[in-house]
């Protein structure tokens, strides 16, 4: 397990650097003479027509609805594996990261709502600081290499996966638009087909892919966010075949490099470009960016630490062997790296609002995530033993 985690983190570390480059490139283009080209490129209409089916969306929405569905497929595969065989497969293992993740979602959301109380438009962004970017958080931790105990890596991985599960539930419940009955019926039929494949022990990924594509289109047309199709597909793919092989893990390993080196950087490039030219100091200090930034920087670590501490004191959970509160605290700070996940929720929360709110949300996410990453990295570096000690 330690080797698998090391391989995973080494890939995430490189991906984290690529994400930073993508964000920097997006900000550079959005604040340069190329800003018009940048916005025009993302607004390019892309049409796919097959018979009566007609999908017609700007490139930005193809990225957010299509590529991110593959990312959520990967998240679903990771969640299923951890629930059945990994760090969340027993109550003892799952209890502490579960309480930590709940606190890490509730407190940041509360801080955001405190700053945006009374404004029904901006209140829609309450879930933005509740998210943790698993790839970026693990990538920052990976920079410290072998100094980080395996138990601490597993704790962050488990916490981030539960956080992702919470985000999936939030999207399903709070960020779905008017529902189409016909599309939901088609989606339900596709889900029944996927479950039947699983129950029959079908291990070939091709049938899951065909039904999964039908499900994605139906969910896209239904008013439920299309990324949830990826999670449903993941939960239907068998973890273990009769011969001991794992179709689920095979797909997970195949998707990881695509997610790390293509999907997330492309998403970051498409969503992180915020034009700063028309923003005053008053705008930067407005409730949306401040609520998000403080929710990530302060709300995340406070929520994670508070709920973890109470759970341990009430004997509902226990600290991992060899890990103390001084190691948990900087990891709690790293959970404030919302980055791509927070930006994704922002794109849903303010989809129908003035584009300015989306820009402010992305700016708050960038500020909060960068500070959380710096605080978490240097704090953890300080409390961990030096190399060779």
Curated annotation (Swiss-Prot):
A Gene Ontology MF term for this entry? sodium:proton antiporter activity
Give the highest taxon in the source lineage: Bacteria
Which compartments does it reside in? Cell inner membrane
- List the record's Gene Ontology CC terms alphabetically: plasma membrane
Regarding the membrane, this protein is recorded as:
Multi-pass membrane protein
- Asked if the record carries the keyword Phosphoprotein, the reply is no
Record-linked Pfam families: Na_H_antiport_1
UniProt-listed InterPro entries: Na/H_antiporter_dom_sf, NhaA
Q: Which UniProt keywords apply?
A: Antiport, Cell inner membrane, Cell membrane, Ion transport, Membrane, Sodium, Sodium transport, Transmembrane, Transmembrane helix, Transport
Q: Which GO terms describe its biological process?
A: regulation of pH
Family under the similarity heading? Belongs to the NhaA Na(+)/H(+) (TC 2.A.33) antiporter family.
User: What this chain does, per the record?
Assistant: Na(+)/H(+) antiporter that extrudes sodium in exchange for external protons.
User: Which HAMAP family does the protein's record reference?
Assistant: NhaA
- Name of the protein this chain belongs to: Na(+)/H(+) antiporter NhaA
């Amino acid at each position: 397990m330690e080797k698998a985690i090391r391989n995973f983190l080494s890939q995430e570390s490189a991906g984290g650097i690529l994400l930073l480059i993508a964000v920097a490139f997006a900000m550079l283009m959005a604040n340069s003479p190329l800003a018009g080209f940048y916005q025009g490129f993302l607004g390019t209409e892309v049409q796919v027509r097959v018979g009566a089916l007609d999908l017609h969306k700007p490139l930005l929405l193809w990225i957010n609805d299509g590529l991110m569905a593959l990312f959520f497929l990967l998240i679903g595969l990771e969640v299923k594996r951890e629930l059945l065989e990994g760090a969340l497969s027993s109550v003892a293992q799952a209890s502490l990261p579960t309480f930590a993740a709940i606190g890490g979602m509730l407190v940041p959301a509360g801080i955001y709502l405190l700053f945006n109380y009374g404004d029904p438009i901006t209140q829609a962004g309450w879930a933005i600081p509740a998210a943790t970017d698993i790839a970026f958080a693990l990538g920052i931790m990976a920079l410290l290499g072998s100094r980080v105990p395996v138990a601490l890596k597993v704790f962050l991985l488990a916490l981030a996966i539960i956080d992702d599960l919470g985000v999936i539930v939030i999207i399903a419940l709070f960020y779905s638009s008017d529902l189409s009955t016909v599309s939901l019926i088609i989606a339900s039929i596709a889900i029944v087909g996927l479950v039947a494949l699983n129950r029959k022990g079908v291990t070939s990924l091709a049938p899951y892919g065909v039904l999964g594509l039908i499900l994605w289109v139906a969910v896209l047309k239904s008013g439920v966010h299309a990324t949830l199709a990826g999670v449903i597909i993941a939960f239907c793919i068998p973890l273990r075949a009769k011969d001991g092989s794992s179709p689920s893990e095979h797909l997970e390993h195949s998707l990881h490099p695509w997610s790390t080196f293509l999907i997330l950087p492309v998403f970051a490039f498409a969503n992180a470009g915020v034009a700063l030219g028309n923003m005053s100091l008053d705008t930067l200090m407005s409730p949306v960016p401040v609520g998000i930034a403080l929710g990530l920087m302060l709300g995340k670590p406070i929520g994670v630490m508070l709920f973890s501490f109470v759970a341990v004191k009430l004997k509902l959970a226990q600290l991992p062997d060899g890990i103390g509160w001084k190691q948990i605290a900087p990891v709690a700070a790293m959970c404030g790296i919302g980055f791509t996940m927070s930006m994704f929720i922002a794109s849903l929360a303010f989809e129908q609002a003035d584009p300015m709110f989306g820009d402010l949300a992305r700016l708050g996410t960038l500020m909060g995530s960068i500070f959380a990453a710096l605080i978490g990295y240097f704090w953890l570096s300080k409390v961990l033993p030096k190399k060779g000690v």
